[in-house]
Amino acid sequence: MKDRLFLLGQHLLPHHLLSRAAGRLAECRVPWVKNSLIKAFARHFQVD
């Protein structure tokens, strides 16, 4: 179900908008946002 919602979002939103949103998140300097993204990345890709 989670995958279906993700794919639906990708088809409904313009790809350029998704790329820009991802870029904004990647450049974010707000500590709690930045740290949350780093932790999620490390957990997802099993980084030690």
UniProtKB/Swiss-Prot annotation:
This is Phosphatidylserine decarboxylase proenzyme. It is an enzyme of class 4 (lyase). It comes from the Bacteria. Pathway: Phospholipid metabolism; phosphatidylethanolamine biosynthesis; phosphatidylethanolamine from CDP-diacylglycerol: step 2/2. The keyword Secreted does not apply. The gene is psd. One of its GO terms (molecular function) is phosphatidylserine decarboxylase activity. Its EC number is 4.1.1.65. Belongs to the phosphatidylserine decarboxylase family. Type 1 subfamily. Keywords: Decarboxylase, Lipid biosynthesis, Lipid metabolism, Lyase, Phospholipid biosynthesis, Phospholipid metabolism, Pyruvate. It catalyses: a 1,2-diacyl-sn-glycero-3-phospho-L-serine + H(+) = a 1,2-diacyl-sn-glycero-3-phosphoethanolamine + CO2. The keyword Cytoplasm does not apply. One of its GO terms (biological process) is phosphatidylethanolamine biosynthetic process. Binds 1 pyruvoyl group covalently per subunit. Its cofactor is pyruvate.
